[in-house]
Amino acid sequence: MSETEIYDRLNELSSYFSFGRVLGYIAFFETIGIESQLKHGQDANKDRMLSSELNFLAGLWIQNVVLDKTWDITLDDDFTREVYKLMDDLHSLYLQKNDLSNQFVEVFFYEGDLAYDWQYVDFARKKYNMPLLYNVLKNEYHFDINVLTSTLTKLKCCIEKQIKRRRSEKWKRHEYISPMNAFTIKPNIIKKKFSPEEQSVIKALSFGLEGQIAKRIRKITDFNSYIQYPIIELPNNRGYFCVNESAISVAMNETPFYWLQDSLSFGKKLGSIRGDIAEKLVLEIVQRRFLKNVYAHIPITKTKSSNMITDIDVFFSYKNAGIVFQVKSKRLTELSKEGDAASIENDTEKAIIDAHEQGLKCVECMLNSTEYYSLRKHVLDYVKSLTLYNVCITLDAFPGISTLSYLKTYQQISPIIAMSLYDLDSIFYLFQPEQIVD
């Protein structure tokens, strides 16, 4: 099948309300059912589906669904297998394309999860904890960052418990388990188990199945409203369909960014606010492992009265090594995710190359630290004897950051080391100081 034919078929299937059951089956296979696959092996790569692919299918459903259009339950297995095959064929088509634009699309879309769910939620609380940001989110959007962890935990527990209970009860009676109901939390459960603040978070991240989509999806690269609002509110007070828990954790972290962009409270200040927050978060991560010789926001000036040459965002030294972190809050734009070469170049320049070159300038100055007033003032004249490394950090998950850094390294004097805040957090979570420096 051609790419157009695949999209046409997926659009047709997703126009059925019954397609929600296919989404439920996929969610079951890729989460609860994964234990069986790991024990008994997988038939082929097409037996697995990424979270990004499930998001795309859910986005098609909320866009195309006709509520009174259904198919017989006996057809569920056939259509589920067909959807797996269609998505596998679509991926294969992108793998076969040789142009750079589509190769980047393949990297961005099929890269997989960029952080753990608990990281998304934990850093959401930290990213938006500044009073000004916190108040806008809570007062204008009824989104309290202090209850994100408890909300996600309760959602996961509710789904897990009801699936476990239904599997046991239905199996004993040889009854059918609806995959849509399995991932749907009833309104009475929401009211009983969740606090008013937690209910507001759920509501803020919900999309009514009868709602209107602002931007229609034509292909996997298009903006997908489901990613922003991954809790689907089913009609007739049926409940909240939480088919992708991973998407909910990502939305808790990233959807507030879009709200803040739309707010009139910031103007052009949001970028600088995010930059300051990014530096503080990197500093917090570093200080978990290194208690001494850790510095942040150090300006580099030749003399007391001269202009600033550059500045060090975060730095630490350990034994004979020193690490310079340059932190950026630049995100990969939607246009880049669509494969636009000029946009990819621009995003890479602002998020990675600028940070890398700024870091190199810092390293150059630090190798001659005794010549710089500000470094002597901060008792950093000793760093000239260290082996210095330069690392770029992005505040948000940045799809394709490893690939883009690798490709750009060929244009640089020294290799580019770039990662997201979540990657850095994982490294400092898993390893001790000696291992981190090594």
Predicted regions span which residues?
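Short, surface-exposed, polar/charged, turn-prone segments marking secondary-structure boundaries
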Residues: V324-V327, A351-A355, I417-Y422
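Catalytic cores of nucleic-acid endonucleases
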Residues: S329-L388
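Beta-sheet entry/capping signal
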Residues: N293, D313, N320-V324, T387-V391
